[in-house]
Amino acid sequence: MFASAYTLKKKNFVRHISYILGLGVLGTIVAMTVLTLILNYGNELYRDPVTGESWVDPAECMLLAAVLASTDTVAVLTLITADKYLVLNAVLFGEGVVNDAVTILLYQAVDREIQKAEAATNHGIEDGAPGHKDITLGRKEISGMIINFFSLSIRSIIMGALVGLLVSYVLKVFNLNYDPIKETTIMIMFAYLSYLFAEQTALSGIISMFSCGLFMAHYAYWNISKKARVGTEMAVCTIANCNQSFLYIYMGLSAFSIEMEYVHMNMVYTTLIAIFVCRIFSVGVPIFLVWLSTGMKPLQLKWNEWVFVYCGGLIRGAIAFGLGLQMTTDNNKVLKNTVQICALVTIVGVGAPI
C-alpha cells in the first residue's frame, strides 16, 4: 500500500478521478452489498431442515462479503502498457489502490460491530439465556458500522498525513543531502512508524501508511537528494514486490492446509457465483452514474477495455487472503477456508487465462 501511494502517478490519477473513485469507492460498497445479499440468501436456502443450522451466522456473511469485495488487478495490469492504454492503465491501477483501502476499512468496521454483537450475545448466554444464537446486525449495528467506517477513514488518513508532514519537515530542517542512505532510511522508518502509531491508537495502520505515502511523495520527496529519490523509490518497490511474491507463494502452499471438514461446497459455489455477479453491478452502477454526471458524454474507455476492467476485478488476491486470515468469529475456520478456495480458484481460473 505504501509503495502504491509513494509511486502513484498523480496526474493520471487526478485526470481520471471520477472513474477511479466510482469503481474504487462506490464499486466496492456495491460489491459488498450484492455479495452480502447473495450469501445471506444462500445461507438461508441451504439451512439444514432438521437441525436448522446454516453455514455461518448472518453477520458473518457480511464480514465475508467485506473481505471478498477486494479485487486484485495485477494480472490484468501485466498485460497492458501505460503508453498504449493510458486511460485503462490509470483506471485499473487507481481502482486497485482505492479498492484495497476501502476494503480494509469496511472489513474493520464490520468486524468491530460483530465483536460487539458477539460480546453482548455471550453475556446473555452467561446470564441464563438459551445456548447458541445467530449473530445478526440490525439497523443500529449497521448505522454504527457506517459511522465507524467514516470515522476510522478520516482519523487514519489524518494520522498518516501528520507523520508524512513530520518527516518532510525533519528532512527539510536537517538537510541530509550529503548522505542519501540516511535519507532513504528515514523515509522508510517514518513510513513504518505511521503504521505503528495507527495500530497503537486503534486506527487502520495500512490506511495510515497509505496516506503517509501520498504526503511523503508530495512533500518529503522534494526535500531529499536525487540519489535518495531514486534509492527510496527502488527500495519501497523492491520490498513491496518481495512481500507480494512471498504472499502468493504462501497462498499456493496453503492449498495443502485447507481443512475439508470446514468446507461447505454449496457455500463455495454460491460465493464464486456471487463474485461474478457482484462485479457486474460494481462496474455497471458507478460507470452509469459517471456517465450521467458527465451529461451522457461518450465514455473514455471502449467496450473491450471495460471487459478488461470486469475481468480484472474478478480476481481475489493478497488483500482478501490476508484479511481472511485475520477472522476471529465463531465460524472463522469455515470463512477462512472459503476465502482461501475462492482466492485460489479466481487466481488460477481467471488470472491464468488472462
Say what each PLM segment does.
Residues 1-354:
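Transmembrane helical cores of multi-pass secondary ion antiporters/exchangers
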